[in-house]
């Protein structure tokens, strides 16, 4: 039970460390369609981040119970699932 208290913070540090390497960009310049479980405010990197996001070309987020979003990147880099960076919810 005690190991669970330390697992989440160490995972979060790994994600934030990866996100910190993103260069500053315009908000809508590199926006791509993604599906996320939730979009939440973030202190660093500034803006909003998406939780449990994946690239979505079919735009069927509602079918899986996720939120249709637009994010600049997903970290860690090179994967299809992860934390969305600089996200916004699509209407």
From Swiss-Prot:
The keyword Disulfide bond applies. Its main location: secreted. It is found in: Secreted; Secreted, Cell wall. Disulfide bonds join 31-70, 35-61, 36-53, 71-87. Residues 1-17 form the signal peptide. Keywords: Cell wall, Disulfide bond, Secreted, Signal. Self-assembles to form functional amyloid fibrils called rodlets. Self-assembly into fibrillar rodlets occurs spontaneously at hydrophobic:hydrophilic interfaces and the rodlets further associate laterally to form amphipathic monolayers. Belongs to the fungal hydrophobin family. Aerial growth, conidiation, and dispersal of filamentous fungi in the environment rely upon a capability of their secreting small amphipathic proteins called hydrophobins (HPBs) with low sequence identity. Class I can self-assemble into an outermost layer of rodlet bundles on aerial cell surfaces, conferring cellular hydrophobicity that supports fungal growth, development and dispersal; whereas Class II form highly ordered films at water-air interfaces through intermolecular interactions but contribute nothing to the rodlet structure. This is Class I hydrophobin 3. The lineage of its organism: Eukaryota, Fungi, Dikarya, Ascomycota, Pezizomycotina.
């Amino acid at each position: 039970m005690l190991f669970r208290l330390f697992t989440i913070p160490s995972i979060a540090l790994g994600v934030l460390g990866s996100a910190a390497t993103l260069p500053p960009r315009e908000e809508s310049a590199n926006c791509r369609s993604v599906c996320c479980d939730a979009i939440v405010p973030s202190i660093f990197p500034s803006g909003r981040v998406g939780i449990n996001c994946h690239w979505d070309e079919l735009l069927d987020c509602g079918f899986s119970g996720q939120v249709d979003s637009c994010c600049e990147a997903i970290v860690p880099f090179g994967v299809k699932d992860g934390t969305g960076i600089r996200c916004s919810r699509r209407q």
